[in-house]
Amino acid sequence: MTEYLSVSALTKYIKYKFDQDPHLQSVLIKGELSNFKKHSSGHLYFNVKDKESVISAMMFKGNASKLGFEPKEGDEVLIEARVSVYERRGNYQIYVNKMQLDGIGNLYQKLELLKKKLKKEGYFNQSNKKLIPKYPKKIAVLTASTGAAIRDIHSTINNRYPLVEQIQISTLVQGTQARQDIIEKIQYADSLDVDTIIVGRGGGSIEDLWNFNEEDVVKTIFNCQTPIISAVGHETDFTLSDFVADVRAATPTQAAVIATPDQYELLQQIKQYEYTLSRYIKQYIEHQKKQLNHISSYYKFKQPSLLYDQQIQKRDELERQLNHLLNTKVEKSKHHLKLLQQSFNFKNLNQQITQEKQSIYQLHSRLSKIMSNNITNLKTVLKNKLESLNNLSPTNTMLRGYAIVNKDNEVVTSTHKLNENDQISLTMKDGSVDATVKKVRCNDE
């Protein structure tokens, strides 16, 4: 009698065959993700396809949590899985254990992971950035010895700020040996006592620029004591070196612009400073001239004796007061002596007279000494003031042969204020002279 199998029995048998085949327990598959879904449980359901075929796939939550990227529709992936049968539907499918992006996608995945790691460790913090010197004396340029990058940097620096010294350090920027060469050249440039380092190269694919994403290159830039400008690739290219550098330039040309001031802008600033300073000096000189003219016209400087007449009079008054005080004291003493003579016996009179004479003599000596000291001090003070005033006096200056030149009742302080045939007046120590200017000679001509 013929025996028929149930659908379930056949499906279980086929599943048993799949599960027992060692070649199906670990297969490596390359394909594109499609119909991707993430279940609320954390499991992933999707298809893996190529141009000719499609296979169903699922990935349990435990394995999905270990992925280094977020899978999405259209990703090209490399998968490690086992092949089995889903009994309920009778479909064969793959159960994915590991999955990673294929090719360039894998590089982007690696880049993103390293970027997150370095950012978390503080390598990209703004507080670690160093300022780029405004007026550098030396700039080290690290790039390939040939190519557009080095030409653009050198020509831009020469046009903007030719005073700076450029130190070209030929550096490998692509290939297996470039990573170590970049590290060594940055360390070498840091030892040269330059003001700024430019690290750059032209554009390229992510593979071409990858050396500037290497972790040890990033850390070398971070540890550099000299400010670094990163100019790797074109404006749309970003590397980890850009994030860790003190400044990121979109292109090598922009790096040269950031590193140097514009000589033409500096010249304009210098001219503006020169104009401002010149105007200030002229204003200051004019103010001082006005002050001098004002002081020179003061009436006491025209008659210096007016400055010390009061002091002389005050000294004479003090002298009269001292003499009067002395005479008054002497008269009082004489009167007192007379009273004593009348009050005491004649026998004691000589003794009393002698004592009074001594007292009067001592008093007279003290008063004379006080008066002499006061008069001497006053004479010294007066003499010093007279000497100071005479030194400032225009009259004293004229006694040495100088004359004051006046034109239209104003003091002439410069030959630039005179012209031929001008009528002038020369004031001397004993009078004045009217004269006519025949010729003007200036020292600066």
Swiss-Prot record:
Keyword Hydrolase: yes
EC category name: hydrolase
Pfam families: Exonuc_VII_L, tRNA_anti_2
EC number(s) on file: 3.1.11.6
Source organism of this protein record: Staphylococcus epidermidis (strain ATCC 12228 / FDA PCI 1200)
Source lineage: Bacteria, Bacillati, Bacillota, Bacilli, Bacillales
Catalytic activity: Exonucleolytic cleavage in either 5'- to 3'- or 3'- to 5'-direction to yield nucleoside 5'-phosphates
Function: Bidirectionally degrades single-stranded DNA into large acid-insoluble oligonucleotides, which are then degraded further into small acid-soluble oligonucleotides.
Example of a GO cellular component annotation carried by this entry: exodeoxyribonuclease VII complex
Record-given protein name: Exodeoxyribonuclease 7 large subunit
